[in-house]
Amino acid sequence: MIIKPRVRGFICVTTHPVGCEANVKEQIDYVTSHGPIANGPKKVLVIGASTGYGLAARISAAFGSGADTLGVFFERAGSDTKPGTAGWYNSAAFEKFAAEKGLYARSINGDAFSDKVKQITIDTIKQDLGKVDLVVYSLAAPRRTHPKTGETISSTLKPVGKSVTFRGLDTDKETIREVTLEPATQEEIDGTVAVMGGEDWQMWIDALADAGVLADGAKTTAFTYLGEQITHDIYWNGSIGEAKKDLDKKVVSIREKLAVHGGDARVSVLKAVVTQASSAIPMMPLYLSLLFKVMKEKGTHEGCIEQVYGLLKDSMYGATPHIDEEGRLRADYKELDPQVQAQVVAMWDKVTNDNLYEMTDFAGYKTEFLRLFGFEIAGVDYDADVNPDVKIPGIIDTTA
């Protein structure tokens, strides 16, 4: 079939398998052209491995460090008549290129929050890899069925303690509008912490450690975003921020557990990028459109692959890690450059419907958004007939 982008709200409901493959190849080429990660990981588990930062971590480990990788994700395959999810096509492409390089790459499709998927992952590590020396936790999910209670909990994006009114960008209508969000209830805050906080990360590490599949010296990291003053009311000081602060609490006991065997656990702070998750946050499209303009003019703009490759090479496995007073690894320092933030703040209130394209890089934002789904990739013929039914050989599909 011939597949064109169809966008509804903050989701593109179509995906392009050839475009997704080309996007993965671009990321692989970035890593191979920037050289190996010295003393990098060799057997890696990525939880949330199919898109965004998790996919970038899988690519960086495999093609920057020659690592065997096991990826866990929740995606949907395509059929003859309907495209699958972008994450499915990304993972199919990754496995294809890894196999060409002689690297082990296997994937598990299912609910990473469940005990069942954790057990299947452990069994697969025992059978195929023995032990893993790096665990990357990169899950973004709107809800979680708690494995111990069976309760399905939802996360909420709201301020805490007060209602907040801010400028937003309606990406469908391409208009600037005021958005008011009411404060989260305590139940909503608790739910967000349960879905987006550190409990599941801790459950994963406990399960892997108890099963004896963590190598001596194993490291783990969970990805987070902090942002700066302009996004704090809705992000760091909001319900999502409460979940992110929970990561900072949980990492302490995870670090203590791994340190016994010479390992380490860190929260890694990454910059704001266009992802399916960030496009759902009301103020992020405007913030990102301004940030891209400023950072591109400065020559410091980065996407997922630049961020994660740099994080692994410089901070997780390098001699001079960027680390803050909380013990977090920082890859967001170019975004938080005071000059960059000052320029974003100065332009924030000046953007109007009429000057949106001149004042911001909304055009770049839209391109990045479509690239998530395999569109707007250079060299891809979008008028060609493509087969949306792409197989992932050897996948362990717990959803089938």
Swiss-Prot record:
Pfam families, alphabetized: Eno-Rase_FAD_bd, Eno-Rase_NADH_b, Enoyl_reductase
Positions of NAD(+) binding: 48-53, 74-75, 111-112, 139-140, 244, 273-275
Catalytic residues identified in the record: Y235
Pathway in which this enzyme or protein is active: Lipid metabolism; fatty acid biosynthesis
Transmembrane segments: none
Site (Plays an important role in discriminating NADH against NADPH): E75
Residues making up the signal peptide according to the UniProt record: none
Domain of life (superkingdom): Bacteria
Keyword entries, A-Z: Fatty acid biosynthesis, Fatty acid metabolism, Lipid biosynthesis, Lipid metabolism, NAD, Oxidoreductase
A GO biological process held by the record: fatty acid biosynthetic process
PANTHER family the UniProt entry points to: ENOYL-[ACYL-CARRIER-PROTEIN] REDUCTASE [NADH]
Subunit structure: Monomer.
Name recorded for this polypeptide: Enoyl-[acyl-carrier-protein] reductase [NADH]
Organism: Burkholderia vietnamiensis (strain G4 / LMG 22486)
